[in-house]
Each structure stands twice: as C-alpha cells, then as structure tokens.
Curated annotation (Swiss-Prot):
Binds 1 Mg(2+) ion per subunit. This is Succinate--CoA ligase [ADP-forming] subunit beta. Its EC number is 6.2.1.5. Succinyl-CoA synthetase functions in the citric acid cycle (TCA), coupling the hydrolysis of succinyl-CoA to the synthesis of either ATP or GTP and thus represents the only step of substrate-level phosphorylation in the TCA. The beta subunit provides nucleotide specificity of the enzyme and binds the substrate succinate, while the binding sites for coenzyme A and phosphate are found in the alpha subunit. Mg(2+) binds at N209, D223. Substrate binds at N274, G331, I332, M333. One of its GO terms (cellular component) is cytosol. Residues 9-254 form the ATP-grasp domain. GO terms for molecular function: ATP binding; magnesium ion binding; succinate-CoA ligase (ADP-forming) activity; succinate-CoA ligase (GDP-forming) activity. Its cofactor is Mg(2+). Keywords: ATP-binding, Ligase, Magnesium, Metal-binding, Nucleotide-binding, Tricarboxylic acid cycle. It catalyses: succinate + ATP + CoA = succinyl-CoA + ADP + phosphate; GTP + succinate + CoA = succinyl-CoA + GDP + phosphate.
Amino acid sequence: MNIHEYQAKALLRQYGAPVSDGRVVMKADEAKAAAGELDGPLWVVKAQIHAGGRGKGHFKEKEAGEKGGVRLAKSVEEAEELARQMLGRTLVTHQTGETGKQVNRIYIEDGSDIERELYLALLVDRGTSRVSFVASTEGGMDIEEVAASTPEKIVSFSVDPASGLSDFHGRRVAFALGLSGAQVKQCVALVKNLYRMFIEKDMEMLEINPLIVMKDGNLKALDAKMGFDNNALYRQPDILALRDETEEDPKELAASKFDLNYIALDGEIGCMVNGAGLAMATMDIIKLFGAEPANFLDVGGGATKEKVTEAFKIITSDPNVKGILVNIFGGIMRCDIIAEGIIAAVKEVGLQVPLVVRLEGTNVELGKQIIGESGLNVIAADDLSDAAQKIVKAVKG
C-alpha cells in the first residue's frame, strides 16, 4: 500500500526526521489560508498523487498551464492560483502512463534554501531477506537513471537483523553522501529514526529524494515516498487509515476485497489462473504467440464460486479485453468450482469476447461437463500451448 507525500512527511515528523512545515488542501479556496499559516516567503505547491516524476510531468488540460506538478509561489495569492490550476486536473508522469492521475489534493509547504540534493532509501532486499540502505550523492533525479549511467555513485548495504542497526551504519551512509562535521551526527540520528520507523510500520520501501543539505548545513527530507506490506496491514490500523482508494485502479481495488491477486496491464487478453507461477507462465506464452496479457490474476487455491464469479466480472469490466483465457490446474482448486463460477459470471454480465478454457486436475471431467452442458460459446483447449494459440487466433484472427 502506498500513501501520499504529505502523509509520509507526517510520519517522518512523528519519528523525529527533519521536514518542512506544510498544509494539505482539497479545495483551491483553502490554499490562501493554508499558505498564510506557513512562514514563507517562498511556498512550494505540490500535486499529491501516487506516482513519481511529478515535477517533470505535465497536465492534460491547458487550464493547468505548461508546468509540472511541483510549482513555486512567491505569495499566498499565487499559491491559491497554482492550487486552482492543478486541482481536479490530470497529471501525467513517466510512472502514470498517458492516462495520468487526477489531482485531488495539494500540499503546500515552506520553501527551503538548497545547497545540495542527495538520495537515501530503505527497502526490503528479497535476495538477502534483509533491510537495505541505498544512498547516492545524485539526489533529485530518478535513481534508475543514476544506476544506469553512473552506478559507482550508488552505495548499497544491508543490515543484519540479528545484530540490528548500529551507529556505524549511519556513519557509512553519511560518508557515502559526502557529509562531514555536524552533518554526520545528524545523519546517524536520521538513519536510526528511519530504520526504526521502517521496522515498526512494516514498510517495504522508504525513499527520500531528495534529502537536502540546506545552506545553513542542516539536513532535511524534501520529498518522501513510502510503501507498506499489504500482508501486515491487519496490525497497522493507523497506516490502513491513510489508504486513498481513489489513487488505486478500480479493478485492483475490487479484487483486493475478494482476496484476488490482480494487477492491471495494457494488453488485450484477460487471464484467470490459479497460482502465481502458472499465471506468469500463462502471460509469457501469450506474449510468445504474439499478443499481450491484459492482467495478472491469481484466484488462489481456495477460491469459491462467488470468488471466481467476481474475478471473471473484473476481467470483463476492462474495455481493453478482447478475449479471455482461463487456465486452471486443479490441485486444491477444483475445476468444477471454476466452471460454476464462469457460468454464473457469464449469466450475470454476458460474454462479448472469445473465451478459451483449459482445465486440468481435480474434478476436470466434471468441470468440462458443466461447461459443455451450459450452452456457452466456450473454446476448449487441451494444454497451455494449445490454449494460448487458440485465444490469440480468436482475438487477432
């Protein structure tokens, strides 16, 4: 689960990390008063969406102006006008795709005197099963670009969970960032607070980009991005309360309510599969035969008829879907349950696109019988390769 920048900074503030004072507004009329509560004389007006690259992005609407989603105001009146330009508009960045995201919140914060821009992040390294720090002197830009062009400017190391974090980890980060003197002590304290927050809040990723050195020599987190482990949200009610469902794909949101593992993609062939590995293989073979998957969807091993029905409805709600491939290898998941769910969904929402079904495993004959006697226009397949070829042919001709 992701949260907005203003929410991330509130968390940073709780854990003693240095951040600018700021206010969030949802109406342009509130912006002038919000900016007036801050010191000024420079205000930063930021669009709040769950995507990076806001400053380099652009708005679809001409009314929003030609600048990106991070703008500077030199008066409270200008802050109000900038908020008015951005609220309700669609911001497009390299992470949103051409669809973009609507801006429903604006964060106004005090400007900062920037001497240097640095990069600092914590993430779960799945290779080592540890929390890793990533630090670079090249802040204020995409870390992917730095990694590709100047990888030597990135320092990364993990923390042994048995011994935990020590001061030398903080000093290692400080030296990697080129800090000296009192800044090293600030960095050690910051690293301790960030690590404690990362562990206590069950985070998957915490990125501060940029972490700035101000002209007075102090450090400050100028931007923050946080991601949390969905599987741990049951014990993080305060984090769950920060969830902004308007920032999530409606189909992914609906899937989460039925415990379906769904990720929307850009292709034309919808997939319903049981098991993440088989789902990945299904997507790969669709691409192999010349088409693109419209989604990743794992219904899991203990799916019910209702769950399968909902999964099918989510797939068919995507206007880009031109065909559907159901690929089930029944172990715990019974093929007859899948068949009953498909039939129930088709009766409810109809079937306007080709449907290829490949069933194998537990109760496979019963599943095929149920589909065969349903009267549905279903294309049967014997194996995965056969199924992929048939759905691609049905869609592309």
